């Protein structure tokens, strides 16, 4: 792919960097490298510090290594952050901060070959890591009625999932995005936005195991952050945001056992910085429509 054909604008870039409170000597992780927008900003603020940037998309890693200055204190790691990574298995240090930007990059969305968009008639792929075997096409043509219905209801919140799945099974094999859109146009045309939006979201989440990966990555981050380190997360739909809110609440709330004779109030692992999600400004939403659904949440490590 010629990366010059696609233009990506990082969402809430300044706000995310400000919330991280970068220390020049600190050690940081950008858990979702993407098109390097946040990575470059973090690296430019480091002096004696270092940044580890992760991405499971080999194309993103390759482009980053070509684009980034070799003098910047960065190591690019082709891996999803939740998988046993170099920093969690071989490095004996703690982190001063970690950033998760959970959105797809414009390069992934706008590249027809990746199969993420319902606006192009391309093979139903949707893999962020092209080395994995499961594609959206495989799921549509091989999953059972119950499995597909569950995916669409849980990950897409599709109201008439049964009708959609019945037609998918009837029309098998589905090969391209337009094969699927022809079905969603008939059975999902009353939902807000494009008829295929929620179906494609559900498939993408299943293909890449996005929600399970997020849960594991958040839990892993707790073990790597030093006291006063910050975790900054930018989400783009309610399913992600729900997981983040639950994680922050779970680790910032202490439930006193009923049988304890005295009230002990220990320090919780996290304190929440953003009591409500921080949203893009009106100006940013006007300049970058893909920022409209973004929510930023921040917590600080206590112990």
UniProtKB/Swiss-Prot annotation:
Gene3D superfamilies: Putative methyltransferase TM0872, insert domain (1.10.150.170), Vaccinia Virus protein VP39 (3.40.50.150). Belongs to the methyltransferase superfamily. RsmH family. It comes from the Bacteria. Its main location: cytoplasm. Its EC number is 2.1.1.199. Specifically methylates the N4 position of cytidine in position 1402 (C1402) of 16S rRNA. GO terms for biological process: rRNA base methylation. Transmembrane segments: none annotated. This is Ribosomal RNA small subunit methyltransferase H. Keywords: Cytoplasm, Methyltransferase, rRNA processing, S-adenosyl-L-methionine, Transferase. S-adenosyl-L-methionine binds at residues 36-38, 55, 81, 101, 108. Pfam families: Methyltransf_5. It is an enzyme of class 2 (transferase). GO terms for cellular component: cytoplasm. The keyword rRNA processing applies. The gene is rsmH. It comes from Aster yellows witches'-broom phytoplasma (strain AYWB). It is found in: Cytoplasm. It catalyses: cytidine(1402) in 16S rRNA + S-adenosyl-L-methionine = N(4)-methylcytidine(1402) in 16S rRNA + S-adenosyl-L-homocysteine + H(+). The keyword Hydrolase does not apply. One of its GO terms (molecular function) is rRNA (cytosine-N4-)-methyltransferase activity. InterPro entries: RsmH, SAM-dep_MeTrfase_MraW_recog, SAM-dependent_MTases_sf.
């Amino acid at each position: 792919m010629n990366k010059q054909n696609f233009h990506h604008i990082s969402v809430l870039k300044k706000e995310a960097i400000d919330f991280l409170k970068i220390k020049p000597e600190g050690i940081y992780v950008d858990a979702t490298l993407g098109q390097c927008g946040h990575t470059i900003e973090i690296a430019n603020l480091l002096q004696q510090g270092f940044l580890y940037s992760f991405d499971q998309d080999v194309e993103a890693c390759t482009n980053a290594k070509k684009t980034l200055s070799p003098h910047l204190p960065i190591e690019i790691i082709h891996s999803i952050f939740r998988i046993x990574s170099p920093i969690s298995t071989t490095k004996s240090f703690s982190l001063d901060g970690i950033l998760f930007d959970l959105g797809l990059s414009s390069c992934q969305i706008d590249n027809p070959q990746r199969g993420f968009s319902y606006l192009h008639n391309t093979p139903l792929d949707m893999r962020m890591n092209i080395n994995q075997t499961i594609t959206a096409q495989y799921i549509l043509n091989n999953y059972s009625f119950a499995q597909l219905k569950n995916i669409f209801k849980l990950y897409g919140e599709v109201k008439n999932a049964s009708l959609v799945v019945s037609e998918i099974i009837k029309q098998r094999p589905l090969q391209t995005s337009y094969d699927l859109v022809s079905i969603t146009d008939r059975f999902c045309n009353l939902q807000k936005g494009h008829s295929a939006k929620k179906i494609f979201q559900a498939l993408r989440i299943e293909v890449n195991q996005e929600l399970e990966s997020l849960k594991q990555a958040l839990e892993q981050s707790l073990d790597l952050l030093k006291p006063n380190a910050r975790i900054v997360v930018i989400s783009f739909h309610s399913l992600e945001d729900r997981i983040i809110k639950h994680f922050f609440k779970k680790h910032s709330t202490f439930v006193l056992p009923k049988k304890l004779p005295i009230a002990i109030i220990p320090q919780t692992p996290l304190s929440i910085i953003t009591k409500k999600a921080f949203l893009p400004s009106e100006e940013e939403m006007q300049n970058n429509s893909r920022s409209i659904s973004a929510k930023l949440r921040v917590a600080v490590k206590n112990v």
